[in-house]
Amino acid sequence: MTELRDETPLFHKGEIVLCYEPDKSKARVLYTSKVLNVFERRNEHGLRFYEYKIHFQGWRPSYDRCVRATVLLKDTEENRQLQRELAEAAKLQIRGDYSYKGTPDKPSAKKKRGGKAAHVEEPIVVPMDTGHLEAEHEMAPTPRAAGNRTRDNSGGKRKEKPPSGDGRLKGNRGRQTETFYNNAINDVSVYNHVPQEDRIMMRVSERLRELIEYDRNMIKVLGKQHALPARVPIVTIMENFVKQQAVELAISIKQDSSRARNTQSRNARMEREYDRVMSTVCMLKEVVDGLRIYFEFHVDDHLLYTEEKEYVHNYLTDDNMRNCSLILNKSYEYINPSGDTELIGLDGTPVVEGSGDTNGQIGVINIGGPEYEKQLQKCLLYIVTASGKNTAQAYERTSPYTAAYKLPVEMRGFLNETFKWRLLSAESPPEKSMVFGAPHLVRLMIKMPMFLNASPISNKKLEDLLPHLDAFINYLENHREWFDRENFVNSTALPQEDLQRELLDSLDGIAA
């Protein structure tokens, strides 16, 4: 006869678990869930047992329910593999078509569409190697991507199709190798229900993956620490991104609008384009401010390795925070110490500050003075270099430089106002985004799908937001100098000779 005993609790409040589908009439699959509470009960024999109130992440609270431990599994890699196998067996919908975008509002017609597309093989891709970040639980656990598998056994090669209508900007395409990273909690979904966690997926390029792995190795393998405050802090990166996007949008307006055949239609078109640019720039300001708030809220719990925490917390004293704020407010040129400060005319020759003539363009500098000109030059130089050209090609007829100096006075005035914009005012209290730099910001961007999936943001707003996040990630990728070894300081945790030897080995791929 089996001896009756008190049950011991197997899971604790707040723990991430895998829960079997409670409805036995449906496919037997595992859902990523969270233990909201643990209740101690007594059975008819007076023996203790436990029930666990489970929230299926991404589902409405009305789906929360109490279950016994028999339907729960620990969140381990082995059980994640079981979750994927059960999903395969149940023939669940596999997602993975979107770059940093996936919404459950796809029309049913698209889901049912068959024909050739139903027999096209989706390439097997490897999820971004953030297993170091997750499996060791030194950063907040983020499940590995699991849904990027072949849909059948056909041998055809799937053509990659860019998402339509997402307004993605040029500059980060043409990469031969890209990996998918699904930060959604569940990597698969049933046709008749798509959990909130599956709304967003992120495509991570090899360039970004390389930077992330380099950052991880410097911290966890070589015992380095990020120099604080960062040479270019997060608030500065965000400000410069908005200014950069404003210049690119302004130039595109001029190039498109000049094709109109008559003056009246051209003016009407340009007026509409001006309104679009201004509203887009205003939205970008809100986007980066939202990212900054996310960073301030999550940096301690989600964006630091274990090896960093003591160093960071020792640095973030009130005095150091105040000093970072003072430095940023007193020296605005601190935002881009590597930027060119010499003004260049359209003919490639230096322009004397204070001059009102740039290659015959009267009044160009008078709009904003030398500071406007310097900021414009930095943005234009980025456009030229990001397009793969060298600086000598910056003065060709089709160059962005030429278009920038032909902008109407109204748009140049708007750019001047944008260049003066600050994400945080001089009166703002010290923030952590004034201290940390691009590596920690990239960690946030990798986690953003998880945060947004858990947010109540509507799908329509997500569709508007995701192209801007995609452009921001591309902007970070194009500034490798924010991630190089000059941004790290030595640690005494390892012998110096060991650090130097390991550093040389790790820099073979990144230093180029």
Swiss-Prot record:
Result of changing L465P:
In strain: 820A
Outcome of mutating K220M = In strain: 799A
GO MF, one term, reads: RNA binding
* Keyword Endoplasmic reticulum appears in the UniProt entry: no
Highest taxon listed in the record's lineage: Eukaryota
Q: Name one GO biological process term.
A: sex-chromosome dosage compensation
Q: Where is the composition biased (Basic and acidic residues)?
A: 149-169
Q: Where is this region: Disordered?
A: 98-175
Q: How is it modified after translation?
A: Ubiquitinated by msl-2.
The effect annotated for Y405H is: In strain: 639A
Keywords of this entry? Chromatin regulator, Chromosome, Developmental protein, Differentiation, Nucleus, Transcription, Transcription regulation, Ubl conjugation
Q: Looking at the UniProt record for this protein, which Gene Ontology cellular component terms does it annotate, in alphabetical order?
A: chromocenter; MSL complex; NuA4 histone acetyltransferase complex; nuclear chromosome; polytene chromosome; X chromosome; X chromosome located dosage compensation complex, transcription activating
Record's InterPro entries? Chromo-like_dom_sf (IPR016197), MRG (IPR008676), MRG_C_sf (IPR038217), MRG_dom (IPR026541), MSL3_chromo-like (IPR053820)
Q: Where would you find this protein in the cell?
A: Nucleus; Chromosome
Q: Where is the Chromo domain?
A: 11-90
Q: What is known of its domains?
A: The chromo domain specifically recognizes and binds histone H3 trimethylated at 'Lys-36' (H3K36me3). The chromo domain also mediates association with roX1 and roX2 non-coding RNAs, promoting recruitment to the male X chromosome.
Assembly with partners or alone = Component of the male-specific lethal (MSL) histone acetyltransferase complex, composed of mof, mle, msl-1, msl-2 and msl-3 proteins, as well as roX1 and roX2 non-coding RNAs. Component of a maternal MSL subcomplex composed of mof, msl-1 and msl-3.
Function statement: Component of the male-specific lethal (MSL) histone acetyltransferase complex, a multiprotein complex essential for elevating transcription of the single X chromosome in the male (X chromosome dosage compensation). The MSL complex specifically associates with the single X chromosome in males and mediates formation of H4K16ac, promoting a two-fold activation of X chromosome. Acts as a histone reader that specifically recognizes and binds histone H3 trimethylated at 'Lys-36' (H3K36me3) and histone H4 monomethylated at 'Lys-20' (H4K20me1).
Protein name as it appears in the record? Protein male-specific lethal-3
Which species is the source of this protein?
Drosophila melanogaster
Q: Which gene carries the instructions for this protein?
A: msl-3
